[in-house]
Amino acid sequence: MLTNQLLRSGTSIGANLHEAQYAQGTKDFISKFEIALKECHETEYWLELLYETGYIPAEQFKPLQNDCGAIRRMLIASINTTKAKQ
């Protein structure tokens, strides 16, 4: 169950970014990025839960947590930059 949720939220980030490439305007583009950001937060949650319940060890969790943090920061920067250009 947990791994299915992680897979769903993690792949949804990429799916929404792909959809953003074909957005019907800036508002739609930002919306897709904001959805991807929410999915990134959810992915971080599932990773933390898997780690805290002992399903994944720290040596697997830490790099994944760092990757999620980097993706989150990139998404936030992209959203803020796009909003500033409006």
Model-identified regions with their sequence ranges:
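Short, C-terminally biased terminal segments at protein or domain edges
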Residues: M1-Q86
